[in-house]
Design a protein with these regions (language model features):
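Transmembrane and membrane-interface helices of multi-pass
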Residues: 1-77
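Ubiquitous "structural anchor" signal
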Residues: 4, 102-105, 198
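Hydrophobic transmembrane signal anchors and adjacent membrane-proximal interface regions, especially
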Residues: 6-8, 114, 458
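Membrane-interface segments at or immediately adjacent to transmembrane helices
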Residues: 56-134
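Solvent-exposed soluble domains appended to multi-pass membrane proteins
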Residues: 116-130, 134-137, 142-498
Length: 498
């Protein structure tokens, strides 16, 4: 986003200087014929062979990983610093190709989907379906869950106290400090980043046609209108292209807010965001139909400059980490988010229509690496497996303004949140949602790092010795068919029949 600060280091400056020299040489050479046509052919062939060999070794093989060069990290920008722009960029190309899962075939997929498409999902007995509001809150995280953080007062008191008619707990994201769109992708489609290339963004790389997911599921059951709201530019992560493919009727952006709208850290506040949300709800045209809105907030977006908020800093970091003003600024922004959530819940408490709100953070904040090192008492660049997952843990809740069974969820992941939502709202599930509901009983959480089984044991995604390897492989087959199956996509499994 446009609030990040650009810092040019020595390596970057050298790279641009070399690039300028190279361009100058090419312009010079263009004016002179150095080789005859036979020589040019030879040099072209040799160049192609060198390039092919380079890409085979450095892009598509495991050579770099075998010598200890690891690009699979939570913050890829650090790899550009450590390994250089050329090598990191070239290696990234290898991650953009999605390999067809082993033993993939349409018949193999049908064998899995048959039991779900043959059975009939039960639909709610409610005479009126509830309105559904899904909020993915920018960088909303609980840093106390990462390490021993001492603060002067709680920064999310309302979130913690909200228990009545509430399902809450922690969900695991597949991204850290950025790539927000990947969290919403997992939530809205039920797919996981575990089977997609590292550092890829499906919105920008893979979604080119109608995309199965929560919005189409709700539309096919009478939800209208189905809105998306994001108080920033529409072009971010190609949302203006992707949201129609997902089934949204209209996409509201910062263009739909007044220039006098309150901001913090250059972004529209959650309070103003929710006022727009309420306005869209109150002024919808189809008031006889259930309402659905998906909201991606912006308030807590980085970068953080450590400045004092205009509202005053109420939360102060104490102890060894008190010098980190950026983290302190962030925590005070989270408290603002908590207050805005309280206002939103209090509003819908008074609404007569049944309404469900699902709320979750997209990822943890992009704060100083040294802050996280001290918070965790280790070098976060060396974290692996379950220890690394501490950086992917964010809070979530599902609240209703009517009676539902309260539940505390120790851990889940973004791809499963829609299954909890479907159960609370009483909506009819697709075969895919039924499958995910059953899968979460055995594998309650999965993300790009790995997964936990029902007993709390952690596994890497590609661990072939895991007793759940076959279940994971089946999930991979289904996701591949969903995203890349084209004409072979099992539509009766991924969509509700009209």
């Amino acid at each position: 986003a446009n609030t990040y600060q650009l810092q040019v280091d020595v390596d970057t400056a050298e790279f641009f200087m070399m690039a300028l020299v190279l361009v100058a040489l090419l312009l010079k050479l263009d004016k002179e014929k150095l080789f005859k046509w036979k020589g040019r052919i030879i040099y072209t062939l040799v160049s192609c062979m060198i390039f092919a060999g380079f890409t085979q070794v450095y892009v598509y093989s495991d050579y770099l990983e075998n010598i200890g060069v690891d690009f699979r990290v939570y913050r890829p920008q650090y790899k550009y610093r450590y390994y250089g722009t050329l090598l990191t960029t070239m290696r990234t190309f290898g991650y953009l190709h999605v390999t067809q899962p082993k033993d993939y075939s349409v018949s193999a997929v049908k064998k899995i989907t048959k039991q779900y498409t043959d059975s009939n999902s039960t639909e709610s007995t409610e005479t009126k379906k509830p309105n559904i509001i899904a909020i993915m809150n920018e960088s909303f995280a609980d840093l106390k869950e990462v390490g021993d953080l001492q603060v002067s007062q709680d920064y999310m008191p309302f979130f913690r106290k909200l228990k009545e008619n509430t399902i809450k707990g922690y969900t695991y994201s597949s991204v850290f400090g950025g790539n927000t769109a990947n969290s919403e992708f997992e939530f809205m489609t039920g797919n996981t980043l575990a089977f997609l290339p590292d550092n890829s963004v499906p919105y920008q790389l893979f979604l080119r046609s109608k995309t199965a997911g929560l919005t189409h599921t709700l539309k096919n059951q009478g939800y209208s209108p189905c809105y998306a709201l994001h108080p920033f530019y529409k072009t971010g992560y190609s949302r203006y292209k992707v949201y129609p493919l997902m089934g949204f009727d209209k996409f509201y952006t910062s263009d739909n807010f007044s220039v006098f709208t309150d901001t913090v850290n250059y972004h529209i506040t959650d309070s103003e965001d929710y006022k727009k949300l309420i306005s869209l709800y109150e002024n919808r045209t189809d008031k006889d139909k259930p309402f659905y809105l998906f909201n991606v907030t912006m308030q807590n977006h980085g970068s953080y400059d450590g400045s004092t908020l205009e509202t005053g800093d109420d939360v102060q970091i104490e102890g060894d980490l008190q010098s980190y003003s950026k983290a302190e600024q962030y925590l005070n922004m989270i408290k603002m988010s908590d207050n805005a959530l309280k206002e939103l819940v209090h509003y819908f408490e008074k609404v007569d229509e049944p309404t469900v709100i699902v709320f979750f953070g997209d990822h943890q904040p992009d704060l100083e690496e040294d802050f996280y090192n001290k918070l965790l008492h280790t070098d976060i660049q060396k974290l692996e497996g379950e220890e690394l997952e501490k950086l992917y843990k964010v809070p979530f809740l599902i609240w209703a303004n009517y009676d539902i069974k309260e539940e505390n969820v120790e851990r889940t992941s973004n791809n499963y949140l829609s299954t909890y939502l479907a159960e609370v709202a009483g909506i009819k599930k697709t075969g895919y949602l039924e499958y995910l509901t059953k899968l979460r009983e055995e594998i309650p959480a999965i993300n790009a790092i790995g997964y936990w089984d029902k007993n709390g044991k952690f596994y890497e995604v590609d661990d072939k010795k895991s007793p759940y390897y076959e279940l994971i492989h089946q999930y991979n087959l289904l996701e591949y068919n969903n995203l890349f199956g084209k004409d072979d996509q099992q539509k009766e499994f991924f969509y509700i029949k009209n």
